[in-house]
């Protein structure tokens, strides 16, 4: 196993522990707590994949971080912070909408890269909106935290979420996954639109009908994908 993979996991475990202690003191805001829960699932998945114990990794990560801090000067820290572009966290959904449990009468699941797409194929003839919480850097979607599909009545009928065991995805991965979800929901004559915020940062455009500018070829491909899996 690559030593950098192990040490990266160890440092991530320790930094998660520090953030958890911060949250336990009721100092974290909603985006902070949301990322904390997501990262916990990711660490569990990575630990299982690597065959590493999280508690042991956390202790090792603490030693690595302490060694780095001992060597770090205040001036070097200021320069590092100044050189790193800041990302923004954008929210279409409330914390309640993100954490709410939901159930599917006819569940369908598809994995696309490091993203998991889930939808309820029992939903028909509904108006549906896709909402997402995600981070943005350089005015482009950076990381998807969670996307969910809601009916006008507020019911959750679909979802796109990162796989904890496969971290890392691009904005193109997210757009392709959204296309698959739209194709699956429209197969049952639902009308789907995407939130303005998600359109603006994923596609750099905003249509009044809420439809992202998917090329006709991509639409046909997605329709065939859903049809073959039903």
From Swiss-Prot:
Residues 1-73 are annotated as: RNA-binding and homodimerization. Residues 180-215 are annotated as: CPSF4-binding. A motif (Nuclear localization signal) lies at residues 34-38. Gene3D superfamilies: Influenza virus non-structural protein, effector domain, S15/NS1, RNA-binding. A motif (Nuclear export signal) lies at residues 137-146. GO terms for biological process: symbiont-mediated suppression of host cytoplasmic pattern recognition receptor signaling pathway via inhibition of RIG-I activity; symbiont-mediated suppression of host gene expression; symbiont-mediated suppression of host mRNA processing; symbiont-mediated suppression of host PKR/eIFalpha signaling; symbiont-mediated suppression of host type I interferon-mediated signaling pathway. It holds the Pfam family Flu_NS1. One of its GO terms (molecular function) is protein serine/threonine kinase inhibitor activity. Residues 223-230 are annotated as: PABPN1-binding. Residues 209-230 are annotated as: Disordered. One of its GO terms (cellular component) is host cell cytoplasm. Inhibits post-transcriptional processing of cellular pre-mRNA, by binding and inhibiting two cellular proteins that are required for the 3'-end processing of cellular pre-mRNAs: the 30 kDa cleavage and polyadenylation specificity factor/CPSF4 and the poly(A)-binding protein 2/PABPN1. In turn, unprocessed 3' end pre-mRNAs accumulate in the host nucleus and are no longer exported to the cytoplasm. Cellular protein synthesis is thereby shut off very early after virus infection. Belongs to the influenza A viruses NS1 family. Homodimer. Interacts with host TRIM25 (via coiled coil); this interaction specifically inhibits TRIM25 multimerization and TRIM25-mediated RIGI CARD ubiquitination. Interacts with human EIF2AK2/PKR, CPSF4, IVNS1ABP and PABPN1. This is Non-structural protein 1. It comes from Influenza A virus (strain A/Turkey/Wisconsin/1/1966 H9N2). The gene is NS.
């Amino acid at each position: 196993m690559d030593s950098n993979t192990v040490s990266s996991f160890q440092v991530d475990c320790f930094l998660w522990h520090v953030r958890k202690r911060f949250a336990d003191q009721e100092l974290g805001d909603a985006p902070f707590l949301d990322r904390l829960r997501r990262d916990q699932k990711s660490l569990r998945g990575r630990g299982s994949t690597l065959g590493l114990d999280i508690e042991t990794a956390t202790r090792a990560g603490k030693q690595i971080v302490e060694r780095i801090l001992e060597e770090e000067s205040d001036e070097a820290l200021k320069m590092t912070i100044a050189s790193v572009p800041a990302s923004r966290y954008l929210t279409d959904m409330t914390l309640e909408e993100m954490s709410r449990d939901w159930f599917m009468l006819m569940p369908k699941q598809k994995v696309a890269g490091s993203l998991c797409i889930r939808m309820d194929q029992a939903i028909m003839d509904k108006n549906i909106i896709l909402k997402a919480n995600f981070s943005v850097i350089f005015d482009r979607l950076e990381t998807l935290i969670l996307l969910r599909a809601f009916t006008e009545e507020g019911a959750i009928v679909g979802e796109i979420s990162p796989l904890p065991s496969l971290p890392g995805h691009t904005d193109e991965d997210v757009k392709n996954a959204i296309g698959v979800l739209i194709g699956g929901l429209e197969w049952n004559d639902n009308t789907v639109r995407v939130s303005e915020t998600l359109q603006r940062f994923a596609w750099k455009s905003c249509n009044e009908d809420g439809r992202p500018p998917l090329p006709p070829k991509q639409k046909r491909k997605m329709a065939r994908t859903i049809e073959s899996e039903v």
